[in-house]
Amino acid sequence: LSSAKASSYLTVLRLPQAARTFGAALVARFAYGIVFLALVLTVDRATGSYAVAGGVLAVFGLASSLLAPYRARLIDRHGVHRALLPMAAACAVLLALIAAVGWQSGASKAVLWVLGAAAGACAPPLGPFMRTLWRELVPDDEQLLQRAYSLDTVAEDLLYVVGPLLTGALTALAEPALAVLLSAMLLLGGTAVLATSPVAASFRGSAAPPPDTGGERAPTPPGRDPRWWVALLEPVLVTAGLGACMGAFNLLAVAFADRHGAAATVSWVSAALAVSSALGGLFYGAIRWRLSTRTRLPILTTFLGVFCVLSGQVTGMVGLGALAGAVGFLMAPTLTTAYLIAGEVDSESRGTEAGTWVNTAFNTGNAAGSAGIGLLLTPLPLAWCFAVTGAFVLLPAAVVALFRTARKNRVSTPGEIPQIAATLNPEGERP
């Protein structure tokens, strides 16, 4: 890392149209910080069944996560007004219908399941789209772009901290369905304002089909070229492992606290994760790194995995909280680095889709990690479970490191490097 003074975060927000665009995107993304807990509470109150509530949340989450890359491809292809805004409008309407159906007890379970799945299928990938816009907002300055991505990651994390608190307040004061309705309003309103931003409005969807080439073979679209997927493999593999690690770690923290007779203190472990992640993200963005993003990624994940393994060796909640803070301090930087690499892979034609695959990998890994470690908690000691949690990120880090070594040792024949190599730069740097 370099001691050169980095641009401040205020410099990022002072860029033309940056504050307006980022602010509108955050308002829309705040809906996702609210809606997950709001759906559980609303459906539970309407049906009297946690099983139904969990099922509705599951179909919403699965539809949202698994279909996100394809919705992102539509945005890359058709732009804001023909893809992003209609998605947000459809999702908002469906969430409003869930709020209306769930406002009173005795709601139809089947209707709630269908509405939940449909709303998830329409949920726009606002985070990846905003990260695509950052590359338009930020001039040709990699350090400033790193700052922007770090700020974006930290702000998104905070939305998922504040959102459940607001949902709880609305539930206590009124009805949980009001929180679902609020999320619909935030999603539609924020996306509508975002669409009026000049930088978002000018996003034309550069992944549109190429014009007629007069009988000549058109170039393979980057998203269909195998090399596109190879270049995206590293951030996707690492974030899948990171998601599994964090999903498992959160469950293990609860089990650890319960076995030490300190269940009430587990919230402090969660707080340590959240606060340290924000601090780590801000610190990471302030550093001018000499190492490339693809070199940093396995290093960050290796340290994070080691801290997870060490968490199984502590004997009290104070020690677990300290190591949770260390894990959290590296979480936002790891995600930021993965997002940067995804943007570097293909920022010109499928930047939103590339970033969305990273999101999908994290969310899928998170669910798998929680489920997997839950099965191991009974037969294995806690220390071994923490070791498995660390392995979730250590193994991808090792694979990525070996992959990079193999690519460096590969000798390319002069004149045979295709044009796409400029975009799929193995060092993750713009040509």
Residue ranges, per PLM feature:
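Helix-loop boundary and gating motifs at the non-cytosolic
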Residues: 3-65, 222, 226-271
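Intracellular juxtamembrane helix-capping segments at the cytosolic ends
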Residues: 39, 124-139, 253, 333-346
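Loop-to-transmembrane helix entry/capping segments in MFS-fold secondary transporters
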Residues: 50-51, 140-153, 263-264, 348-358
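Helix-to-loop junctions at the C-terminal end of transmembrane segments
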Residues: 66-80, 171, 280-293, 377
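C-terminal ends and interior cores of transmembrane alpha-helices
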Residues: 89-106, 303-315
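Cytoplasmic helix-loop-helix junction between adjacent transmembrane helices
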Residues: 117-157
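C-terminal transmembrane helical hairpin of 12-TM major facilitator-type secondary transporters
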Residues: 294-336
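A late C-terminal transmembrane helix in Major Facilitator Superfamily
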Residues: 349-380
